[in-house]
């Protein structure tokens, strides 16, 4: 019987558990795995931006600009920006009635 389905009932003015097989090793292992899964899920939801950014980009923060003249850095920035700029002519205007 799972720990999640145990029923607590008053026994002699105390709260007890009507579960005889709670010492089963499989139940203990399943409970530990469930608790670890819950902890990892909570951490994932709290830090998902940091975690997935680390997987996507690793430890690098972009190309190194050490020893590169400022004019070449600016040219590189302009090329990068022009690569992501969107031409307005590619959009289709849809008019709803």
Swiss-Prot record:
Positions on the Intravirion side per record topology: 44-97
Membrane topology, from the record: Single-pass type III membrane protein
Chain positions with Phosphoserine modification: 64, 82
An example Gene Ontology molecular-function term: proton transmembrane transporter activity
Keyword list, A-Z: Disulfide bond, Glycoprotein, Host cell membrane, Host membrane, Host-virus interaction, Hydrogen ion transport, Inhibition of host autophagy by virus, Ion channel, Ion transport, Lipoprotein, Membrane, Palmitate, Phosphoprotein, Signal-anchor, Transmembrane, Transmembrane helix, Transport, Viral ion channel, Virion
Record InterPro entries: Flu_M2 (IPR002089)
UniProt-annotated glycosylation sites, renumbered to this chain: 20
Gene3D superfamilies linked: 6.10.250.1640
Regulation: The M2 protein from most influenza A strains is inhibited by amantadine and rimantadine, resulting in viral uncoating incapacity. Emergence of amantadine-resistant variants is usually rapid.
GO cellular component, one term: membrane
Region (Disordered): 60-84
TM stretches of this protein: 23-43
Site (Seems to be involved in pH gating) location in chain: 41
Main subcellular location: virion
Covalent lipid sites (S-palmitoyl cysteine): 50
Coiled coil: none
Localization: Virion membrane; Host apical cell membrane
HAMAP family assigned: INFV_M2
Further remark: When the channel is activated, one or more imidazole moieties of His-37 probably become bi-protonated.
Family in the record: Belongs to the influenza viruses matrix protein M2 family.
Complexes and interactors: Homotetramer; composed of two disulfide-linked dimers held together by non-covalent interactions. May interact with matrix protein 1.
Annotated protein name in UniProt: Matrix protein 2
């Amino acid at each position: 019987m799972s720990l999640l389905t145990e029923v607590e009932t008053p026994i002699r003015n105390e709260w007890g558990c009507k579960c005889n097989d709670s010492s089963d090793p499989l139940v203990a292992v399943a409970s530990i795995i469930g608790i670890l899964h819950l902890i990892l899920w909570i951490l994932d939801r709290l830090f998902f931006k940091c975690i997935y950014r680390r997987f996507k980009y690793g430890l690098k923060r972009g190309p190194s600009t050490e020893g590169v003249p400022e004019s070449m850095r600016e040219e590189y920035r302009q090329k990068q920006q022009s690569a992501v700029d969107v031409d307005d002519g590619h959009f289709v205007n849809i008019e709803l009635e």
